[in-house]
Amino acid sequence: MNVVDARLEAQMQENHDDAGQLFDPTAAHPDSVAVCRFIEHRLAFAREPVCRTDLSGGVLYRECLARLARGQRDVLRPVAFLPGLVSMGLMRWFDQLVVSRTIDSLRADAQAVYGCNVSASSATEDAQWQAIFDRLHVEPALAQRLVLEITETTPLDPLSGRAFVHRARQTGCRIAIDDFGAGHSAHNHFVVGRPDIVKLDRSMLAMIRNNAVGRYQVRRLVALTHENAGHVVVEGVETELDRQMSIDAGVRWAQGDHFSRRSDAA
């Protein structure tokens, strides 16, 4: 362990009960080099399956959810470190690292199909993205097993964002619009054109629960989305009731704790 890693490790131990201090977005002089080193050593994935709502079997893919290992059993979730990365201007670097590590995982398992997030602000091609796309271009069978999920945190740039998506598709990757129905996802859907996958935000389930008008609106949205996307997924399915409501709304694929528990039990 070098000096930088040792210092950051010591800081992590000191702030064990308040990990937010390590990636504090309000810090006056954040040590971005040390933070990058730490993330490179601690990045791990929780893989959440996208399953058929009717339980007929099959997994569309597994989303690689970023975690930072902290000790033997504890992990940091994105809410604890992403704001700090954004404030330090490291979001694109982090997304590129996540995609690269996901590609490594696909190479290690020839049967796996994985997805990972790319924030809309990161979806602008640069030298590092070019290197990643070149890597995928020479392994088209691997690229076909990768889903890039465009998140809704910011609007996707109409020019550079569309060029990024086009370049990714040229390699064979599939494109998903994440959290559709929230934030800037509708705009990002327009920029992407016809996405391979649209993932409905978990708020859609709340609309279904609330009243008949909400149920009608979600069914209509699902029907329209099916016309412009290969697959529609609803996120945040946590209970059997959520699964049944998803089926009633016409959604064939779902993701959430309800399916993760079933997958773990299997």
Predicted feature locations:
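EAL-family c-di-GMP phosphodiesterase catalytic domain
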Residues: 1-29, 33, 38, 42-48, ...
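N-terminal sensory regulatory modules of PAS/LOV and PAS-like folds
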Residues: 78-81, 98, 259
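Catalytic core of bacterial c-di-GMP phosphodiesterases, primarily the EAL and HD-GYP domains
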Residues: 90-160, 236
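Structural preference for long, well-ordered alpha-helical segments in enzyme cores
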Residues: 85, 98-102, 132, 221, ...
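Charged helix-capping and loop-helix junction motifs
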Residues: 130-134, 162-163, 212-219
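A short, well-structured catalytic beta-strand-centered motif of the EAL phosphodiesterase domain
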Residues: 44-82
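Helix C-cap/helix->beta junction micro-motif
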Residues: 139-142, 171, 227-228
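Hydrophobic positions in alpha-helices of CheY-like receiver
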Residues: 136, 164, 168, 221-225
